[in-house]
């Protein structure tokens, strides 16, 4: 069986360099390109890459994906900063290349994906739910893509269940004291030296609380999800948002 030809974009970052090692160690994959800032995207086509693992920046990701889709190269994307407009533009590109697949994953940690799923399942059974994400101080976006996605899934589950609005008697507050409001779910961001990537979902009802927490202690925790994404995206055309769709959780 021929090996899957994989390229990594963003190799100078911590997750990118870890992804290079993970692909090199995978028996069913061959690392054909490792690109950093300033390297030519044409290398992807020249080396016959089948999948590009995109781990760059919000400023670079759209240009990188435009190139990949135009050349029929599947993509596994961990870069954040996705808006409705950007997703619509990407879907437009994919419509012109219907056999190409793109996976965008707010988080590649299997445990983090399961945390989102557990929170989604539990949310309709509790009156109150809030999300707290905790990361290292070098993270450039807040709240994290994982926390935003978690809140969206929670809100969707509560809407489908017909849940009442969350109780909150706050009348006056300092700006930001109640966190960001994501579809009616408060999301709080902590930036602290010594942390990597952590999230907890706090759920409350009369007389009880439930906390669902996940901790990534090393960048290696993201590698099984990245490799899974690379293997599955080649047979999943179009746009897939969220690694949970490749985990058969339903």
Curated annotation (Swiss-Prot):
It catalyses: (S)-2,3,4,5-tetrahydrodipicolinate + NAD(+) + H2O = (2S,4S)-4-hydroxy-2,3,4,5-tetrahydrodipicolinate + NADH + H(+); (S)-2,3,4,5-tetrahydrodipicolinate + NADP(+) + H2O = (2S,4S)-4-hydroxy-2,3,4,5-tetrahydrodipicolinate + NADPH + H(+). SUPFAM superfamilies: Glyceraldehyde-3-phosphate dehydrogenase-like, C-terminal domain, NAD(P)-binding Rossmann-fold domains. It is an enzyme of class 1 (oxidoreductase). (S)-2,3,4,5-tetrahydrodipicolinate binds at residues 136, 145-146. NAD(+) binds at residues 10-15, 78-80, 105-108. GO terms for molecular function: 4-hydroxy-tetrahydrodipicolinate reductase; NAD binding; NADP binding; oxidoreductase activity, acting on CH or CH2 groups, NAD or NADP as acceptor. It is found in: Cytoplasm. Keywords: Amino-acid biosynthesis, Cytoplasm, Diaminopimelate biosynthesis, Lysine biosynthesis, NAD, NADP, Oxidoreductase. It comes from the Bacteria. Pathway: Amino-acid biosynthesis; L-lysine biosynthesis via DAP pathway; (S)-tetrahydrodipicolinate from L-aspartate: step 4/4. InterPro entries: DapB_C (IPR022663), DapB_N (IPR000846), DapB_N_CS (IPR022664), DHDPR_bac (IPR023940), NAD(P)-bd_dom_sf (IPR036291). GO terms for cellular component: cytosol. Transmembrane segments: none annotated. One of its GO terms (biological process) is diaminopimelate biosynthetic process. Its EC number is 1.17.1.8. The active site is at 135 (proton donor/acceptor), 139 (proton donor). Gene3D superfamilies: Dihydrodipicolinate Reductase, domain 2, NAD(P)-binding Rossmann-like Domain. The keyword Nucleotidyltransferase does not apply. PANTHER family: 4-HYDROXY-TETRAHYDRODIPICOLINATE REDUCTASE 1, CHLOROPLASTIC-RELATED, DIHYDRODIPICOLINATE REDUCTASE. Belongs to the DapB family. Catalyzes the conversion of 4-hydroxy-tetrahydrodipicolinate (HTPA) to tetrahydrodipicolinate. NCBIfam families: dapB. This is 4-hydroxy-tetrahydrodipicolinate reductase. It comes from Streptomyces avermitilis (strain ATCC 31267 / DSM 46492 / JCM 5070 / NBRC 14893 / NCIMB 12804 / NRRL 8165 / MA-4680).
């Amino acid at each position: 069986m021929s090996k899957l030809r994989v390229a990594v974009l963003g190799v100078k970052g911590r997750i990118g360099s870890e992804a290079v090692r993970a692909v090199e160690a995978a028996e069913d994959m061959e690392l054909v390109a490792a690109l950093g800032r300033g390297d030519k995207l044409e290398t992807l086509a020249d080396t016959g890459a089948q999948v590009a693992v995109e781990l760059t920046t919000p400023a670079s990701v759209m240009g990188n994906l435009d190139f990949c889709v135009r050349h029929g190269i599947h993509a596994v994307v961990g870069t954040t900063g996705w808006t409705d407009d950007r997703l619509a533009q990407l879907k437009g590109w994919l419509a012109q290349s219907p056999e190409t697949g793109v996976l965008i994953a707010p988080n590649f940690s299997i445990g983090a994906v399961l945390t989102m799923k557990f929170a989604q399942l539990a949310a309709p059974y509790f009156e109150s739910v809030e999300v707290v994400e905790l990361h290292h101080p070098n993270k450039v976006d807040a709240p994290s893509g994982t926390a935003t996605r978690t809140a969206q899934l929670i809100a969707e589950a509560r809407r489908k269940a017909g849940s009442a609005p969350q109780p909150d008697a706050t009348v006056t507050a300092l700006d930001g004291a109640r966190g960001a409001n994501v579809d009616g779910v408060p999301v709080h961001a902590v930036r602290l030296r010594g942390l990597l990537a952590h999230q907890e979902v706090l759920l409350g009802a009369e007389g009880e609380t439930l906390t669902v927490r996940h901790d990534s202690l090393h960048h290696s925790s993201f590698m099984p999800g990245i490799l899974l994404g690379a293997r599955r995206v080649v047979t999943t055309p179009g746009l897939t948002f969220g690694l949970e769709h490749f985990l058969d959780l339903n």
